[in-house]
Amino acid sequence: MAGEYAHNVLSGKSTKKDMAERQLDADEKSFADSVDRFISGKEKSPMVRVMTTPLVLELTGAEGLPVEIAKTDLEKILNGKHAGDKTPEITKQLPRALTNPIMIFKSYTGPNGEERRVVVVDLKDRNGATIVVPFELKVTTRKNYEINRIASAYGKTKKKSKNPSYEWFNSQLDEGNLLYVNRKKAINEILQRSPNWPMPEGKVDNLLSAPNVANEEDLVKLKSGNP
């Protein structure tokens, strides 16, 4: 009986993991198709669905709402302000990258009081700069339903040279805005950027280990209790 119970528990966990992976696969394909339609001028909807809010964002207080991006913001990413920095193929990787980011920071509130997050994903733009994804949480759309809205996605670069910039990450850590960190990914990111990283390693270690900051172990625990 004990063996059967253990088998059922493990099977249940495996099934939940499989379900989550299938959902992510479906989200990836759907968003990639939307990006292709946008590029070809065939995307008619003003809002494009990206995915369901990843659990890691729920760790920072976000609700499990649909994640969408406005077609106008997709235009800025691919053809406007950030044109040339991010290819469509990089953009298509956002759903998977958002499920396992490097860090998440709290940000200032939006124009209508929306709470905001900035997700630092494990992707680089064409300049080698780490990509950040600003979110507005719990936004009501024109069709009167709530979403977590991606406001943009771009690499943190110096304005003139387009070289990767690290000052923003440094200031966010220093100001105590860190809500979530994958410690292994964050340390690897910082070590790769040395000696350009502006903050002493000892101080970074203390900030990444702060007891009020969720980490990858908390994400594993949350995933184990959710499909």
Language-model segments: what does each one mean?
Residues 1-227:
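Ribonuclease/tRNase effector modules and their secretory precursors
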